[in-house]
């Protein structure tokens, strides 16, 4: 049975019981800031649905869902359960209320239950992401050729931006209250970019891209260095493909370190239409 959660007190003890669980802890609830933003505030937001799954009056699952009808898009902000039936009920709830929507799930790579159920629904999975956190930043790195996004470069930026994601160049540019973007410029041409949040205590690069023909010229390092420099005095974390050894070494050389037990897996699913 599913009930709408109307107050944090209804689910706080249940959520706390998942901290540190190697299989079922939620990488979206690793800090107090994440608990506030992804769970507590979601209960109050009109575009979020926080639901509890119950069996014999006992909570067996807790899910926070961001739902954007205009975009036909859903993002699971919180997903906590150790029971297959709870995940099944949550997915059926999506099928009942938002058929045809695109849904993104970010969860613990050890959560074999959710992965199996999404596999059965033919979801697409991205590579496992390794979390890294900035310790002592390496300052003084040359950032020549790196500029903040401006109107004059907007068209070029949007043209090369990754379009196979919710946060397209156009959406990032409109979300000035959340993101700042840095561009790599070569002879007046945009050859790379980095989108990074700036409003949190621990900010995160969302997307880093350099055109193929301009790679191995140091632009990725310069973009990250500029983002770190402008982020002071806040912290920074990032996610990188867990098997991308060259990128991990680059980030380690700039002061980032791996965080054990906080990797994540992202799945994309087109909600089934009944």
Task: Indicate where each model-derived feature is located.
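Short amphipathic alpha-helix that is part of the acyltransferase structural core
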Residues: 1-34, 129, 138-167
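Conserved active-site alpha-helix within GNAT-family acetyltransferase domains
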Residues: 109-127, 221, 243-261
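Conserved acetyl-CoA-binding loop-helix of GNAT-fold acetyltransferases
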Residues: 83-96, 210, 216-230, 248-253
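Conserved hydrophobic beta-strand within the GNAT/NAT acetyltransferase core sheet
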Residues: 103-107, 205, 236-240
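Acyl-donor-binding surface of acyltransferase catalytic domains
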Residues: 67-70, 76-142, 265-267
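Conserved donor-binding loop and adjoining core beta-sheet/short helix segment
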Residues: 29-90, 194-206, 212
């Amino acid at each position: 049975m599913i009930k709408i959660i109307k107050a944090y007190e209804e689910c706080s003890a249940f959520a706390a019981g998942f901290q540190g669980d190697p299989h079922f802890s939620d990488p979206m609830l690793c800090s107090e800031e994440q608990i506030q933003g992804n769970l507590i505030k979601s209960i109050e937001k009109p575009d979020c649905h926080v639901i509890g799954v119950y069996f014999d009056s006992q909570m067996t699952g807790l899910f926070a869902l961001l739902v954007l009808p205009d975009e036909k898009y859903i993002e699971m902000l919180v997903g906590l359960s150790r029971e297959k039936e709870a995940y099944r009920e949550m997915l059926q709830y999506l099928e009942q209320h938002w058929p045809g929507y695109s849904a993104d799930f970010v969860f613990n790579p050890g959560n074999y239950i959710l992965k199996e159920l999404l596999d059965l629904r033919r979801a697409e999975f991205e590579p496992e992401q390794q979390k890294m956190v900035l310790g002592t930043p390496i300052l003084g790195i040359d950032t020549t050729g790196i500029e903040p996004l401006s109107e004059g470069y907007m068209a070029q930026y949007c043209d090369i931006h990754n379009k196979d994601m919710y946060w397209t160049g156009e959406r990032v540019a409109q979300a000035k209250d959340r993101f700042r973007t840095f561009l790599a410029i070569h002879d007046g041409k945009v050859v790379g970019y980095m989108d990074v949040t700036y409003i949190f205590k621990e900010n995160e690069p969302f997307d880093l891209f350099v055109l193929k023909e301009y790679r191995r010229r140091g632009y990725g390092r310069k973009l990250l260095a500029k983002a770190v420099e402008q982020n002071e005095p806040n912290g920074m974390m990032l996610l990188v493909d867990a098997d991308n050894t060259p990128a991990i070494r680059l980030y380690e050389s700039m002061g980032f370190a791996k965080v054990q037990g906080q990797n994540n897996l992202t799945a994309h699913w087109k909600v089934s239409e009944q």
